[in-house]
Amino acid sequence: MIGVQGADCAPLVRAFKKNLAPDKIERFPDAHTIAHSIEDDYPPDGDQALTAIRESGGLALGVEDEQMLLAQSMIAKKEALFVEPASSATVALRNCFWTMA
């Protein structure tokens, strides 16, 4: 499982990288992202999400707002769908991996 958050609002990503216990997730100061539906400086179910990511052997990664906007545009052009930025976050991450490969 891969958890994706906006890079400038990523408390789960930070907790994952710091190897914090799920009940020790820290608030993300000055959190801001264009992906408003996932813009939460302390996700209410963050402890469960972090546990699920770890138990699956997964990752928690952040994507920049610009990457989400590019993915949003790509989805609109290829699929004729206009999605909110949060919905394009996973596609943005996939695009990052695709570019690195």
Which residues are covered by each model-predicted region?
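Active-site/ligand-binding loops adjacent to catalytic centers
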Residues: 2-83
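Catalytic phosphate/nucleotide-handling subdomain of diverse soluble enzymes
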Residues: 91-101
